[in-house]
């Protein structure tokens, strides 16, 4: 699968989701949120995958929300959490596979 802000690879039944916005320390913008929704659904639904690793490219896992994004399309923080992040979290929580976070550098909240 091809995404704008995440890389997904699969090798030996292990999938890796790499957040790929290193120039902004992998800050979460709208596109990253949508790509992460699709990527987590893809690895959840692929029965050949047994383990999932999520990491960040560059020197940080994530610096949190992208404060430079002017029009996110969300109607406030609550809407971003419900429509944006919740589907990804639900994919991860309901996934019957180990989901490992490989964190280096900053890992800030959203």
Per-region residue spans from a language model:
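Small-residue (primarily alanine) positions within well-ordered alpha-helices
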Residues: 15, 39, 63, 101-102
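Glycine- (often His-adjacent) and acidic-residue-rich active-site loop
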Residues: 41, 48, 56-91, 107
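Histidine-centered beta-alpha loop that forms part of the nucleotide-sugar donor binding/catalytic region
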Residues: 20, 65, 104
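Glycine-rich beta-to-alpha active-site loop
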Residues: 91-110
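Conserved CoA-thioester-binding segment of acyl-CoA-metabolizing enzymes
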Residues: 1-57, 90
């Amino acid at each position: 699968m091809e995404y704008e802000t995440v890389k997904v690879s699969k090798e030996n039944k292990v999938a890796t989701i790499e957040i790929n916005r290193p120039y902004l320390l992998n800050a979460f913008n709208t596109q990253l949120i949508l790509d992460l929704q699709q990527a987590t659904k893809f690895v959840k639904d692929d029965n050949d995958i047994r383990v999932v690793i999520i990491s960040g490219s560059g020197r940080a896992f994530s610096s949190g929300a992208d404060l430079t994004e002017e029009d996110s399309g969300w109607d406030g923080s609550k809407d971003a959490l419900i429509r944006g992040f919740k589907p990804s979290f639900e994919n991860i929580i309901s996934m019957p596979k180990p989901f490992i976070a490989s964190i280096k550098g900053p890992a800030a909240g959203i």
